Amino acid sequence: EHRIKHPIVYIMACRIGPFAGHFYKEIHKLGGIVYLNPDGHEWMRAKWSAPIRKYWKISEQMMVKYCDLAICDSVNIEKYIHECYDGKGIKGRNPKTTFIAYGADLTLSKLADDDEKLVNWYKEKGLTKKDYYLVVGRFVPENSFEVMIREFMKSKSKKDFAIITNVNEKFLSELEDKLHFKSDKRIKFVGTVYDQELLKKIRENAYAYFHGHTVGGTNPSLIEALGSTDLNLLVDVGFNKEVAEDCALYWSRKLGSLAKLIDKADQMSTDEIAEMGRRAKKRVAEEYTWDKICGQYEDAFIK
């Protein structure tokens, strides 16, 4: 329609694998090229049935084959692409890849601690500044909600555990049947928060943040947590460690691991926590600013 010469078509995620070859050829006929962001391991997500997971995996293979460049948002995803698909590209070639992560906003919330919006939210949810652990994320099994709730219940912490998520009632019922968390007044499902300034302030005022994502590449909520919450407790997987490095504490999904870490975190001094926060913010400022990410995209698209 716009007669663009040498267009670059950037496809996000690996949904349309069966059509990838057709579109690749048509775009090349127009003098264009195809870039792909393979996203994370969608085929591993527990929310999908076995046939859908199989489709995602096959679709991923076809889309990696029929692209001119795969832009991976994680070093581990880039490594995975080569381990799985080297020699499986067009004419047996290896896929061409590059790494460009996500960015994060490092500015502090505009809300003060005595802002009426924040005060009312805390009052409604029964929470107090620096007296709650926090998690923000999709309510799906691969984000380790069962482990986080189970381990928090086993911990000796006197603090609350605030869970900001859009609850899936079926999954919630399954967790209650397994864990009986409703008997523990510290576990608080507090709904969703779409006001970004309020959410940012809630992050800043958390005693610590849990990140339990086990599937996918660089997760935006992890970068946001590192940029706003001083103390971060992350599940020990490659995707998380490549982002946070030594700026966070790590736990495994094994029984007792996170509970032990929570008890340790509760005993950390104010200075120790502040130092963790300083390192985390420095890490994000050096590697995950939008200026840096946008510059890398400009290089990929213009050069």
Sequence positions of predicted segments:
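Membrane-proximal helix-turn-helix segments that form the acceptor-binding/catalytic region
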Residues: 52-70
